[in-house]
Amino acid sequence: MKDIATPNRTKDIVEKYGFSFKKSLGQNFLIDTNVLNRIVDHAEIGSESGAIEIGPGIGALTEQLAKRAKKVVAFEIDQRLLPILDETLAPYGNVTVINKDVLKADVHEVFNEQFEEGQDVMVVANLPYYITTPILFKLLEEKLPVRGFVVMMQKEVGDRLAAKPGTKEYGSLSIAIQYYTEVETVMTVPRTVFVPQPNVDSAIIRLLKRPKPVVEVTDETFFFEVVRASFAQRRKTLMNNLSNNLNGFPKDKELLDRILTEVGIDPKRRGETLSIEEFATLSNALVLHKLS
């Protein structure tokens, strides 16, 4: 049997079931087995590993994962795809498809039911563009015990995740993801290897979870509030952004100026120039004056 991820096999499956693509679900099926293998290679899936997939579509990536992993669990929100997946994944007895929205599912419960304690598990997915960021944050913030993520996403979002200080892509998203993970751009993927073709190119991004966050902060919630406030208006200085947008901090520009100067950060700098370490230092100084 031919791999699912070929133009002809994908076309045959779609026509057989009369499947119509839903733009609202970001459905773009990958038709290049080489790209799928690059994804699975970088996930370093072994014969004892587990994999969580989100949005399996007709099972193209699922199939490649099932060939290598001990167990694959795939979340699929679209009920119309279930009979297709029943057929395409029939040769593989190590796949469980769960018809749930991963953003609403109790992922810890599923994880504990489907995987062995201490098993090496990766999230491997061709993520729908419109929910890439919410999915990553849900799984990171809920501290799902996975080794990391290898995910296909819109190239523009991938660039933001991997961005360095001082670049136009760098922002609160870069800091939030890099706080929890080491980010690596594996490859850019042209839009031509999808059916239907999206309007943008994609990238494969690998995120390996850090044993502990990259910086130590006194108050994690406040740290992210400082970061978000610093990027509220990109063209404004830190002084302006923090004095206008940092909730829970006194509206006292003199105090703010003094704290910034004490930690060695020029109040006239913009948020995009600060490293994650500088944000941690700043947050740890500001939190001492937070309104209770």
Curated annotation (Swiss-Prot):
Pfam families: RrnaAD
Residues binding S-adenosyl-L-methionine: 28, 30, 55, 76, 101, 126
UniProt entry tagged with the keyword Heme: no
Domain of life from the UniProt record: Bacteria
Coiled-coil portions: none
EC annotation from Swiss-Prot or TrEMBL: 2.1.1.182
Residue intervals passing through the bilayer: none
Compartment(s) where it occurs, according to its Swiss-Prot or TrEMBL record: Cytoplasm
Methyltransferase found in the keyword field: yes
Gene3D superfamilies, alphabetized: Ribosomal RNA adenine dimethylase-like, domain 2, Vaccinia Virus protein VP39
Enzyme class: transferase
Record's keyword terms, sorted: Cytoplasm, Methyltransferase, RNA-binding, rRNA processing, S-adenosyl-L-methionine, Transferase
PROSITE patterns: RRNA_A_DIMETH, SAM_RNA_A_N6_MT
NCBIfam families linked: ksgA
Cited PANTHER family: DIMETHYLADENOSINE TRANSFERASE (PTHR11727), DIMETHYLADENOSINE TRANSFERASE-RELATED (PTHR11727:SF7)
Name by which UniProt lists this protein: Ribosomal RNA small subunit methyltransferase A
Species of provenance: Bacillus cereus (strain ATCC 14579 / DSM 31 / CCUG 7414 / JCM 2152 / NBRC 15305 / NCIMB 9373 / NCTC 2599 / NRRL B-3711)
